[in-house]
Structures are given as structure tokens and as C-alpha cells.
């Protein structure tokens, strides 16, 4: 992953990880 991406891209990525973790815990 390119860490040069702006925070605008980091936020959606974080939300996807959150949803993924929630789905796996269920």
C-alpha cells in the first residue's frame, strides 16, 4: 500500500477494516 495517499483515502479504508472486523467477530 502507498502511504502517500491523503487521509481522504485512509478514512474509507479504516471503515472497511472496521466492517470486516465486525463481520468476522459475528
Curated annotation (Swiss-Prot):
<comment type="pathway">
    <text>Cofactor biosynthesis; pyrroloquinoline quinone biosynthesis.</text>
</comment>
<dbReference type="Pfam" id="PF08042">
    <property type="entry name" value="PqqA"/>
</dbReference>
<comment type="similarity">
    <text>Belongs to the PqqA family.</text>
</comment>
<feature type="cross-link" description="Pyrroloquinoline quinone (Glu-Tyr)">
    <location>
        <begin position="16"/>
        <end position="20"/>
    </location>
</feature>
<comment type="function">
    <text>Required for coenzyme pyrroloquinoline quinone (PQQ) biosynthesis. PQQ is probably formed by cross-linking a specific glutamate to a specific tyrosine residue and excising these residues from the peptide.</text>
</comment>
<keyword id="KW-0884">PQQ biosynthesis</keyword>
<dbReference type="InterPro" id="IPR011725">
    <property type="entry name" value="PQQ_synth_PqqA"/>
</dbReference>
<dbReference type="GO" id="GO:0018189">
    <property type="term" value="P:pyrroloquinoline quinone biosynthetic process"/>
</dbReference>
<protein>
    <recommendedName>
        <fullName>Coenzyme PQQ synthesis protein A</fullName>
    </recommendedName>
</protein>
Amino acid at each position: 500500500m502507498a502511504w502517500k495517499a491523503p487521509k481522504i483515502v485512509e478514512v474509507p479504508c479504516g471503515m472497511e477494516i472496521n466492517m470486516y472486523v465486525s463481520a468476522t467477530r459475528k
